[in-house]
Amino acid sequence: MVHAKSWTLKKHFVGYPTNSDFELKTVELPPLKDGEVLLEALYLTVDPYMRIMAKSLKEGDMMMGEQVARVVESKNSAFPTGTIVLAPSGWTTHSISNGEKLEKVLAEWPDTLPLSLALGTVGMPGLTAYFGLLDICGVKGGETVLVSAAAGAVGSIVGQIAKLKGCKVVGTAGSDEKVAWLKKHGFDVALNYKTVKSLEEALKEAAPEGYDCYFDNVGGEFSNVAITQMKKFGRIAICGAISVYNRTSPLSPGPSPEIIIFKELHLQGFVVYRWQGEVRQKALRDLLKWVSEGKIQYHEHVTEGFENMPAAFIGLLKGENLGKAIVKA
């Protein structure tokens, strides 16, 4: 008899989520049917997109999300007991799956790397950085790249891939600690956007000739300013808008249409799940190789204990994490 603990949405968020918006429930799972497996969560992820996706949940629904899990009981020959998988099981300690949405961790995964990276640098955030920079922005060596939220799970990888491709990289973050981390890991310029006297002047000083590519993780007023610093024919990959996800007032106006028109800018939003099949597997292998070779550095902000899922999520939205926010079950 297995009891699963699950975090559910008690009430919809108003502004930043609070602990009282969540409720921890325990349910008894049924015996396995043929073709099913029982999963036990090892690591769980919290990500900004959950703030938006939670709007589509009904109160009482379990919070969504991926986890690295171990198969602890199996009636499915494709996933024997002990298999490590990525599972979209949500915020739960145990779950039952028929195997259709499970993904085994790469066979070549070395013992020297933590499995939690499959939720970060060698997972969805890493893939977001990879495809957003290489496919959407299409960066080339010698170009100048601006990355907002550069010390986050996605931005930190964007900047390092851009350096691997021979680009000049300017990153912005919200604390001096994060700025120091960016400088340590190869960013040519790193700025604390909260303390610069003028964001426009700071971005201009960092790249007087402008930016070829802007990887946008924050949206809002920051991005309105960043767009003014783009070169003609600049490309903007719109990945996220974390600066406005928790707003309680109307959204402020977007960037000036005149700038977009006369600079002939290309702005494109994207979601990483567009890339599937072999192209996705190649990207995962590339990311794993770069991490294994030390060409990409990672940092995890690990919260211990499944009971602290809400706190980890709230901290992420408030920018308390450096690198990927992970919960160790």
From Swiss-Prot:
SUPFAM superfamilies: GroES-like, NAD(P)-binding Rossmann-fold domains. InterPro entries: ADH-like_C (IPR013149), ADH_N_2 (IPR041694), GroES-like_sf (IPR011032), MDR_fam (IPR045010), NAD(P)-bd_dom_sf (IPR036291), PKS_ER (IPR020843), PTGR1 (IPR014190). NADP(+) binds at residues 152-155, 178, 193, 217, 239-245, 270-272, 321. It holds the Pfam family ADH_zinc_N. The modification Phosphoserine is found at residue 20. It comes from the Eukaryota. NAD(P)H-dependent oxidoreductase involved in metabolic inactivation of pro- and anti-inflammatory eicosanoids: prostaglandins (PG), leukotrienes (LT) and lipoxins (LX). Catalyzes with high efficiency the reduction of the 13,14 double bond of 15-oxoPGs, including 15-oxo-PGE1, 15-oxo-PGE2, 15-oxo-PGF1-alpha and 15-oxo-PGF2-alpha. Catalyzes with lower efficiency the oxidation of the hydroxyl group at C12 of LTB4 and its derivatives, converting them into biologically less active 12-oxo-LTB4 metabolites. Monomer or homodimer. This is Prostaglandin reductase 1.
